[in-house]
Regions:
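Carbohydrate-associated surface elements
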Residues: 14
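A conserved mid-protein helix/loop that constitutes part of the nucleotide-sugar donor-binding site
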Residues: 38, 45-64, 78-84, 126
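A structural motif in glycosyltransferase catalytic domains
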Residues: 40, 55-59, 71, 168, ...
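Aromatic "clamp/platform" in nucleotide-sugar-dependent glycosyltransferases that forms part
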Residues: 101, 120
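Short acidic/histidine- and often glycine-rich active-site loop of Leloir-type glycosyltransferases
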Residues: 130, 143-154, 158-159
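Short hydrophobic beta-strand element within catalytic cores of glycosyltransferases
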Residues: 137-141
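Conserved acidic donor-binding segment of nucleotide-sugar-dependent glycosyltransferases
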Residues: 153-165, 174-179
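A charged, aromatic-enriched C-terminal amphipathic alpha-helix characteristic of glycosyltransferases
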Residues: 180-210
Length: 213
């Protein structure tokens, strides 16, 4: 920090890309996404912080517009019944499915083509990095903190205004109609993960530790 004449170095949490890829390629039968053009997934605790209501309301707009979309929500928490009630009340159970957290979430993530994060705030959301490892397009709330940094201010995915249902639905529509652009963004996002490489970051930790031995 320049104010205190202190040298600082940012080292991100190590990301084990090879393990995520191995787990993601585990074969299993899962037919929910069959026939859908947009295969969206959200993995988060069912709490107010994760703002599933914004996600569900945006998806409802798209369903009413006859957009071919399915959404898988994976998690657990106090808001589960609230989420289930919304799905039931709006009769969208054919398009939206809830499952509990899984021992291997990556094989479900691999089946999707779009990851959506709607949090009101985060730290550094590892789930975005995991989605990038498995080469999924990301749409995330521009919440404090983490998503903007990970997605390089929109270079490696789409950012929408937090709690803005219309903005989120429009970002999903953009994803639906821009396949070539999406593939380019996914490719660049995957390459950007060198910042979080497991071996590289572990070496950086060891270098710092050695200075104090």
């Amino acid at each position: 920090d320049k104010r205190f004449n202190i040298n600082t170095k940012v080292i991100y949490n190590p990301l084990n890309k090879s393990e995520i890829k191995i787990l993601g390629h585990k074969k299993f039968k899962f037919t929910f996404f069959d026939g859908a053009k947009i295969k969206a997934i959200n993995i988060a605790r069912f709490t107010d912080q994760k703002d599933h209501m914004t996600l569900l309301k945006a998806i409802l707009i798209l369903i009413k517009k006859k957009i071919n979309i399915k959404l898988l929500i994976m998690g657990y928490g106090t808001n589960k019944h609230k989420i289930q009630n919304f799905i039931s009340k709006n009769k969208i159970s054919k398009n939206v499915k809830i499952i509990n957290f899984q021992k291997n979430p990556y094989k479900f993530l691999k089946k999707s083509n779009l990851f959506i994060l709607t949090s009101l705030y985060e730290g550094l959301p590892n789930v975005l990095l995991e989605a990038m490892v498995l080469k999924k397009y990301i749409i995330s709330s521009n919440c404090p903190t983490g998503p903007k940094e990970i997605l390089a201010n929109g270079k490696f995915g789409s950012l929408f205004k937090t709690q803005d249902i219309k903005d989120l639905s429009n970002k999903i529509l953009d994803f639906n109609y821009n396949v070539y652009k999406n593939n380019k963004i996914i490719h660049n996002a995957s390459k950007s993960l060198t910042r979080f490489d497991f071996n590289t970051n572990c070496e950086e930790y060891f270098k710092i530790i050695k200075k104090f031995i």
